């Protein structure tokens, strides 16, 4: 028996064997959907909006012509009002019962219940007009001195309809209702709620509104700014920021909003600044003269105002960087970006944590600041409010120019001193002076983290600032918080191309290598590989410290190997000078050959070999034993050891054959096209076709192992070809009556290959997905035919799987056809060749005929379906391979811990029945965000007992590179628990990463890691 379960993630429907029986399924094809789509949809809407029918008792019984449209057409004949001239909506009802206090209370309770339960999804135009008209009538019936809560709830219902409008006509009708009702409203509570409802509609559906309606809504909100309610003013500013057009915002609304920056209410001041920011973000040009108002607002007593003012200062500084600001107390003038940078730096001394964090984050975005102001952020010397100190010559010249005389020995020594304003004097450093240092020394980690990030952004744009800030970033390695240390490490990695490390800086960095956190150690390995050192002594310090830490933390070998590889590539001349010392080569005596499996010796070899790639004379310094070790490491670690001209390095015959063919082809892509052309020729043959296809399959597999960039594409085609070969082999069994039915394992392998194509590959275009779905449809049809022929198992499950797969591909084709009709025509010359080919892909004749036959079956029982599709399955031509798509990536995993080399030697011993914790580390490439929830860790014991572990989402962390976080490559670091009853001896336990694509079926992403596990009997006490 079988149960059809529809998977939430994905578009296909799977079948799980062994479940209770369910009702028979019928294929819903394009014709069936088109025939019954309307009725089902209307029923769905009626079910969702039935609750609004309860309002009829409060609206009253209207005569047929009572509700008149602007054009004079009764609603009874149209079913809904039409949108027309604003200000002439449908007239209010006249036959409603009088509204008493009890009725008002009942109506309010009913509206609250409806608001909580109603769903607006898939509302048709006619239904929406009818419901909106009903709400409008009920609103008109409410007296102005009655309870405002009813009108507020009615506006909420109306805004809910507006947020789900699918057409411009329906949306403009809702906006007409809002404008008409709010112009006549006098209650500030209702006006404030109406403004908020318009803002919500603008967030969801503003792109559908015509410009004229946007202007009218913004003008309505502008009128409400004169309201005496602060709540109404705030919501009106929200509406202006959302609806005002770019040109209208610059001409009419900017200065109107700027007027309210001086409002008595702090929330109004903050909202006015926020509305200006919203207009600026939407493209309106904010005038530079607003800068002075924003600076004054930064001194506000309320945090919300200072926060918005700080962002406005930042925006104005970046929008008008070269605008010259006059200075009252100085003769020289400042650029606005420099003045804004100084004000943002001052905010780093604010009492509020949120403002200090925001100021530290904004500093990184002001890259146009002058060099002098930027470097002042790292100098804590006290300055006189950023006033430039004048030389004695300049001061004397100024006295002479003044023409004043004094009785003393100096010019103007009796002149009155400069008048000092008490507010301009600051005991601490002001302006940009020492601002980043204050941020790095803040007591809260959020400020320190933001300051480190901003320092990194500024250093990336200014190489001279990167050199100056290096010492301060290195000091952050000693921070007490791990996240701050990691941020400093990754920031230094990003600016590594601009700096060269000194010996004193290396001492602090290398001291952090002994950190207990594995993330910090791996981050330091990445950073050391990206940086450059200045001397041989520094290089020896780094290498020796890495080897010492590797002996202490052997689990860091992979990141240490990668670090040694990068160091060798960046310092070939320094490595050449110390290579003899690192390899213990004596000038007179022959040293003993070292163990090639020693991790420390491996690190040195990786360092030397990668340096020799850029400086070939290093090879002459290597002893003979090292040449043999190179041949071994080149085969075992090809990603860490480069190709070198060393004699004795052998290669396998298959590799040599593929390499020579690729060399003749010119590139991997050309060689792949050559393989695909050969496969097309093979499909035209009749004799020995399977053997040739298997040879092409091995060539595709080998191509992916040689060229990492083509791995996803070649593996996708190889898996597709493997499924084709399996289908062709099973098709021969279905062609004759006497043929032996394949085993269940063969059918399961075919279905597994189809699932791999569907779930482990990303970057597929429409043509690739269509070919995969057609392949799965063929596999399901063949599965049903073979199961019915076998007669030893139920065919209900395969039959349902075939119907569901056919329905899935039918919906997929229908959806793509609908999208193509809605898209505007595209000029073929502007479209890439691959995209045009994939978009024009059509299902083959087998798929079309099979869908037609399944659609014609009224009662799809397995026997009848079998008889209908048997001729098609027996005569099905081979399915063409999809064209090569270089954007395809495959999700693969590599288990780092437990290590296969050490797990055979270290036996995990535990008392039987108790739990042993085993660290588990794996790197997963090309993992989509939606696939993280489907990741599983499968543990298989020697007695074939298995259990599956679901890792936590927090255990997935992106892999860091020199360019930052990798988008699709993640590292899974967790702990798995092993437990079992007593065994006689230690046995292997297999640990594997899988992707759960359907209940009871997982796709393996890597080879299993094996650990020796020995549960011992419990010791009995005396």
From Swiss-Prot:
Primary location: nucleus
A Gene Ontology BP annotation from the UniProt entry: RNA polymerase II transcription initiation surveillance
Start and end residues of each stretch annotated as Disordered: 818-840
Chain sites annotated for binding 1D-myo-inositol hexakisphosphate: 148, 184
Keyword Chaperone among UniProt keywords: no
Gene Ontology MF terms: inositol hexakisphosphate binding
A Gene Ontology cellular-component term: INTAC complex
Transmembrane regions listed in the UniProt entry: none
Nucleus is among the record's keywords: yes
Subcellular compartments: Nucleus
Keywords for this protein: Nucleus
Pfam families the UniProt entry points to: INTS4_8HBD, INTS4_C
Oligomeric form and interacting partners: Belongs to the multiprotein complex Integrator, at least composed of IntS1, IntS2, IntS3, IntS4, omd/IntS5, IntS6, defl/IntS7, IntS8, IntS9, IntS10, IntS11, IntS12, asun/IntS13, IntS14 and IntS15. The core complex associates with protein phosphatase 2A subunits mts/PP2A and Pp2A-29B, to form the Integrator-PP2A (INTAC) complex. IntS4 is part of the RNA endonuclease subcomplex, composed of IntS4, IntS9, IntS11 and inositol hexakisphosphate (InsP6).
Family label: Belongs to the Integrator subunit 4 family.
Primary role: Component of the integrator complex, a multiprotein complex that terminates RNA polymerase II (Pol II) transcription in the promoter-proximal region of genes. The integrator complex provides a quality checkpoint during transcription elongation by driving premature transcription termination of transcripts that are unfavorably configured for transcriptional elongation: the complex terminates transcription by (1) catalyzing dephosphorylation of the C-terminal domain (CTD) of Pol II subunit Polr2A/Rbp1 and Spt5, and (2) degrading the exiting nascent RNA transcript via endonuclease activity.
Identification of the protein by name: Integrator complex subunit 4
Gene that encodes it: IntS4
């Amino acid at each position: 028996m079988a149960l059809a379960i529809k998977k939430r993630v994905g578009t296909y429907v799977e079948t799980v064997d062994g479940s209770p029986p369910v009702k028979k399924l019928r294929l819903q094809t394009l014709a069936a959907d088109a025939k019954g789509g309307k009725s089902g949809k209307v029923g769905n809407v009626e079910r969702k909006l039935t609750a609004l029918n309860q309002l009829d008792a409060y609206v009253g019984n209207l005569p047929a012509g009572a509700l008149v449209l602007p054009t004079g057409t009764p609603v009874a004949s149209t079913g809904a009002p039409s949108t027309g001239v604003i200000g002439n909506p449908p007239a209010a009802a006249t036959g409603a019962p009088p509204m008493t206090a009890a009725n008002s209370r009942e109506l309010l309770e009913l509206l609250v219940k409806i608001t909580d339960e109603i769903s607006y999804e898939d509302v048709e135009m006619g239904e929406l007009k009818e419901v909106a008209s009903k709400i409008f009538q009920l609103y008109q019936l409410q007296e102005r001195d009655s309870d405002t809560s009813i009108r507020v709830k009615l506006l909420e219902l109306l805004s809910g309809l507006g947020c789900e409008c699918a057409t411009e006509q329906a949306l403009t009708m809702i906006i007409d209702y809002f404008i008409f009702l709010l112009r006549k409203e006098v209650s500030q509570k209702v006006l404030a709620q109406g403004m908020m409802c318009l803002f919500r509609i603008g967030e969801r559906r503003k792109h559908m509104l015509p410009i004229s309606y946007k202007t009218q809504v913004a003008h309505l909100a502008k009128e409400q700014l004169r309201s005496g309610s602060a709540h109404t003013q705030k919501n009106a500013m929200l509406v202006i920021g959302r609806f005002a057009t770019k040109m209208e915002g610059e001409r009419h609304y900017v200065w109107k909003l700027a007027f309210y920056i001086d409002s008595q209410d702090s929330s109004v001041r903050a909202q006015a600044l926020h509305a200006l920011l919203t207009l600026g973000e939407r493209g309106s040009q904010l005038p530079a003269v607003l800068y002075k108002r924003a600076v004054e607002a930064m001194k506000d007593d309320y945090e919300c105002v200072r926060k918005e003012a700080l962002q406005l200062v930042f925006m104005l500084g970046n929008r008008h960087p070269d605008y010259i600001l006059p200075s009252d107390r100085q003769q020289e003038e400042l650029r606005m970006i420099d003045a804004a940078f100084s004000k943002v730096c001052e905010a780093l001394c604010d009492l509020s944590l949120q403002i200090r964090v925001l100021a530290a984050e904004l500093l990184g975005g002001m890259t146009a600041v002058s060099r002098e102001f930027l470097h002042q952020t790292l100098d804590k010397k006290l300055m006189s409010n950023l006033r430039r100190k004048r030389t004695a010559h300049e001061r004397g010249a100024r006295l002479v120019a003044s023409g004043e005389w004094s009785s003393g020995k100096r010019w103007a020594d009796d002149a009155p001193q400069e008048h000092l304003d008490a507010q301009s004097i600051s005991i601490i450093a002001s302006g940009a002076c020492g601002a980043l240092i204050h941020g790095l020394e803040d007591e809260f980690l959020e400020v320190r983290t933001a300051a480190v990030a901003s320092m990194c952004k500024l250093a990336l744009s200014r190489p001279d600032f990167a050199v100056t800030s290096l010492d301060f970033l290195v000091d952050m390695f000693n921070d007490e918080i791990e996240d701050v240390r990691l941020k400093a490490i990754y920031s230094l990695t990003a600016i590594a191309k601009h700096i060269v490390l000194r010996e004193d800086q290396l001492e602090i960095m290398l001291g952090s290598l002994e950190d207990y956190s594995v993330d910090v150690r791996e981050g330091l390995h990445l950073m050391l590989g990206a940086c450059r050192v200045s001397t041989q002594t520094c290089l020896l310090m780094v290498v020796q410290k890495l080897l010492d830490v590797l002996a202490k933390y052997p689990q860091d070998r992979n990141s240490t190997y990668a670090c040694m590889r990068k160091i060798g590539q960046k310092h070939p001349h320094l490595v050449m000078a110390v290579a003899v010392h690192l390899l213990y080569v004596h000038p007179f005596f022959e040293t003993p050959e070292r163990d090639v499996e020693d991790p420390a010796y491996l690190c040195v070899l990786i360092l030397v070999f990668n340096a020799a790639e850029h400086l070939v004379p290093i090879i002459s310094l290597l002893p003979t034993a090292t040449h043999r070790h190179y041949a071994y490491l080149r085969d075992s670690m090809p990603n860490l050891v480069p190709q070198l001209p060393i004699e004795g390095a052998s290669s396998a015959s298959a590799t040599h054959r593929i390499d020579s063919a690729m060399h003749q082809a010119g590139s991997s892509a050309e060689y792949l096209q050559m393989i695909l052309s050969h496969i097309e020729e093979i499909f035209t043959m009749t004799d020995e076709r399977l053997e040739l296809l298997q040879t092409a399959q091995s060539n595709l597999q080998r191509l992916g192992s040689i060229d990492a960039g083509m791995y996803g594409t070649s593996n996708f085609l190889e898996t597709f070809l493997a499924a084709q070969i399996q289908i062709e082999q099973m098709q021969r069994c279905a062609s004759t009556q006497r043929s032996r039915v394949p085993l269940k394992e063969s059918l399961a392998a075919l279905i597994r290959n189809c699932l791999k194509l569907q779930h482990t590959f990303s970057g597929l275009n429409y043509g690739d997905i269509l070919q995969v779905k057609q392949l799965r449809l063929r596999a399901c049809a063949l599965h049903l035919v073979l199961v019915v022929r076998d007669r030893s198992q139920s065919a209900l499950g395969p039959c349902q799987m075939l119907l569901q797969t056919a329905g899935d591909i039918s919906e997929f084709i229908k959806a793509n056809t609908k999208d193509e009709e809605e898209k505007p025509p595209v000029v073929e010359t502007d479209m890439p060749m691959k995209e045009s080919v994939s978009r024009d892909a059509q299902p083959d004749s087998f798929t079309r005929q099979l869908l037609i036959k399944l659609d014609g079956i009224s009662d799809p029982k397995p026997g009848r379906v079998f008889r209908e599709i048997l001729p098609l399955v027996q005569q099905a031509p081979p399915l063409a391979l999809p064209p090569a798509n270089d954007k395809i990536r495959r999700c693969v995993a590599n288990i780092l811990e437990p290590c296969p080399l050490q797990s055979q030697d270290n036996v995990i011993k535990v008392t039987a029945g108790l739990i042993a914790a085993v660290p588990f580390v794996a790197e997963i490439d090309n993992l989509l965000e939606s696939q993280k929830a489907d990741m599983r860790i499968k543990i298989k014991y020697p007695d074939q007992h298995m259990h599956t572990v679901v890792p936590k989402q927090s255990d997935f962390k992106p892999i860091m590179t020199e360019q930052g976080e990798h988008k699709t490559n993640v590292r899974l670091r967790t702990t798995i628990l092993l437990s079992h009853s007593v065994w006689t001896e230690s046995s292997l336990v297999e640990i594997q990463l899988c992707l759960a694509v359907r209940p009871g079926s997982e796709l393996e992403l890597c080879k299993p890691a094996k650990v020796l596990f020995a549960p011992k009997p419990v010791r009995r006490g005396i």
